[in-house]
Amino acid sequence: MLGWILYQKDTLQDSYENTRFLEEAKLLQITLKVVHPPDFGWVLGGDFPLLYKGKAISLPDFVIPRLGAMTDTLTWNLLHFFHLKGVRLFNSLSLIRLAQNKLDCLFQLASLGIPVPKTTALHLVESTYSIQRVFDFPLVVKNNVGTHGEGIILCTSDQILEDLMPILLEQTNQNFIVQEYVDTRPGEDIRIVLTQNTVLGTMKRIAGRDQWKSNFTLGGKVEPYPWDDSLDSIASKIQKNLTFDLLGIDLLMTESGYVVNEINSAPGFKGMELALKNNMARLILEQCIEFVPG
């Protein structure tokens, strides 16, 4: 069986995950390679071979896209090509696109009755006065497309927001959202990793010293977190209503319960393996083996 990990060149964020995938693939007798979207050439409408670094190459049995929010137009085109040719993608195109857009994702979750933080699009509230009518300080401003805790700003006062607004509104090629800052458990969140049918793991992420973002990639700590009925209800709704192979869910803890902050179509699992001492790479690859046709 041949599989590819589709990954961005010169990016180290998921180097741990890629290494673990390659280690476990060898033990499972899967031929697995890390490949990069810009190195491919393809043509629609005809019997043309797929090219990789200028040479014809056979299609794999499956592809694991690991770009998440960094999935650009070039990569989208390549993923559509793979889909057209019958290559099994882990995840689906629809799930990758949904997870890439934070606001669309929150709309989808809210429509399922899943609690989400109070959120709006920045262009709908183009003055600090409008924001102050709805949100208390501190509040969070996020790039609508972002990953690994990047593009997130904590505004602690109306003056900081007022200074920031002109800069953000000039970024015509980017969209931003405004979100309440959930301070019930500051610097902490819950990460769930699950498949369509199974919960693979749950952990708490705790921000590092002088940090307010809990991402493990930013130096945060991780520890196991017990499963409970509220988490089960949220996970079950997502599993029943979204189609996916692998999903990371990030939740914040409020006084009234959990709220889902965002989802991730290519969740990192270094922290999960460290906290739970489980083999996430193997569990994910076993899903690939199970669902690849033939």
Language model: regions and residue ranges:
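Active-site nucleotide/adenylate-binding loops and adjacent lid/helix of ATP-dependent enzymes
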Residues: 2-22, 57-58, 82-86, 94-182, ...
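Short glycine-rich anion-binding loops that position phosphate/pyrophosphate groups of nucleotides
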Residues: 68-70, 144-146, 266
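ATP-binding N-terminal substructure of ATP-dependent carboxylate-amine bond-forming enzymes
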Residues: 1-90
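Protein kinase-like catalytic core scaffold
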Residues: 139, 200-201, 247, 259-261
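Phosphate-binding site of ATP-dependent enzymes
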Residues: 150, 154-242
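Residue-level detector of anion-binding/catalytic polar loops
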Residues: 31, 88, 115, 138, ...
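Hydrophobic residue at the +6 position relative to the catalytic HRD Asp in the kinase catalytic loop
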Residues: 249-251
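C-terminal active-site "lid" helix and adjoining low-complexity regulatory extension at the edge
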Residues: 230, 240-244, 253-294
